[in-house]
Design a protein with these regions (language model features):
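Membrane-interfacial helix-loop segments of redox and metal-homeostasis proteins
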Residues: 1-343
Length: 343
């Protein structure tokens, strides 16, 4: 248990710290692709996927990590990811975004997090299990994309590296706007940890490294997998309700670490403060959290479990879920932000 606590908690703490300090929000990034025609954060996300993919595929090849591929429902990945994409716009953050913003003191994120956790728990082990199984048993295929295509996985990795490099290099060649900033208040390590603003591409690199480290770190406890948020969140609420210590796996300490890491980063940068949402935000956060929990359960993952971890191993589920999640974000963004301005 000590290995589980330290391994999961430390990876989560570092992850949460990075997310808070770099303001790495996939909900905002996917929304900006549509509304602002700004793909910067999406390209940073591709960097994270690519970095993780290079490392984890070699770990699998060396036998350090076991076979991560499982069967999944294509219907669940499509319907669930679309619903999840809508939910994260309503909630104001994806799974990790909700966890790290809760650590900053946003009470709206606490509301979204509660309903996300409880609805996911209900889908996985509660009264909504029949609803979960309703879709999970349809259109089931294996997760191994390279195997389905009949090609070595290294071909897919080379393609990913080329595509990511192309977009990143093209973006870096564009003239950068000079943004006015205040003179630094701190010096040394404190400045770099709690004050300096980092480019989103650097954030993507760091997140990719953390995602890579998560694989062998969780393997130490017998768990085959990388970063994942939904199932651990469901297990945490189940433990709180039932007291069943079997629910306390590596992932539970990962998500708790994300919360603590974000809190420490927010306190150190003086960005932590309790913020009370209005009734409209509470309503959206509630509905968004429910959509997130149900959607991620159907899809078998969230923007991290599917969008980052599964895509890195060239999981069919991951590469179906990611674009469908983005489509869900765009749909909700149109309804909530674009359409009212047209009227």
């Amino acid at each position: 248990m000590l290995t589980t606590v330290l391994s999961g908690g430390l990876v989560g703490l570092i992850f949460g710290f990075i997310l808070q300090r770099t303001r790495f929000c996939l909900t905002g990034g996917f929304r900006d692709m549509y509304i602002a025609r700004n793909n910067t954060l999406f390209y940073a996300f591709l960097i994270a996927i690519t970095v993780e993919s290079i490392g984890v595929l070699f770990l699998i090849k060396l036998g350090i990590i076991g076979n991560p591929y499982e069967d999944f429902s294509v219907l669940g990945a499509i319907v669930g990811s679309y619903l999840f994409g809508i939910g994260i716009v309503l909630a104001g953050g994806c799974a990790t975004g909700t966890w790290y913003r809760a650590g900053e003191g946003l009470l709206g994120s606490w509301v979204a997090l509660f309903f996300y956790m409880t609805s996911a728990a209900a889908m996985k082990s509660g009264f909504l299990v029949p609803l979960n199984q309703l879709i999970a048993k349809h259109w089931v295929i294996n997760d191994d994309l390279a195997g389905q295509l009949g090609i070595p996985v290294w071909y897919l990795l080379v393609f990913l590296v080329v595509i990511t490099s192309f977009f990143v290099i093209r973006e870096l060649r564009k003239p950068r706007r000079q943004i006015a900033s205040l003179p630094p208040r701190y010096k040394g390590v404190r400045h770099y940890l709690f004050e300096k603003t980092y480019h989103k591409y650097f954030a993507g690199l760091l997140i990719g490294l953390v995602a890579l480290i998560a694989w062998p770190a969780s393997q130490l406890t017998g768990r085959v997998g990388g970063l994942g948020i939904t199932t651990p969140s469901a297990h945490l609420i189940s433990y709180i309700i039932t007291g069943d210590s079997k629910q306390l796996g590596w992932g539970v300490f990962l998500v708790l670490g994300i919360f603590i890491g974000s809190f420490l980063a927010a306190k150190g940068s003086q960005e932590f403060r309790w913020r009370l949402p209005d009734l409209s935000t509470i309503g959206k956060s509630t509905l968004g959290g429910i959509f997130m929990g149900i959607g991620a359960s159907w899809a078998g993952g969230c923007t991290i479990g599917n969008g980052l971890t599964a895509t890195a191993i060239f999981s069919s589920k991951g590469w179906i879920a990611l674009p469908v999640t983005i489509l869900g974000v765009w749909t909700a963004s149109y309804i909530i932000f674009v359409k009212p301005n047209k009227n």
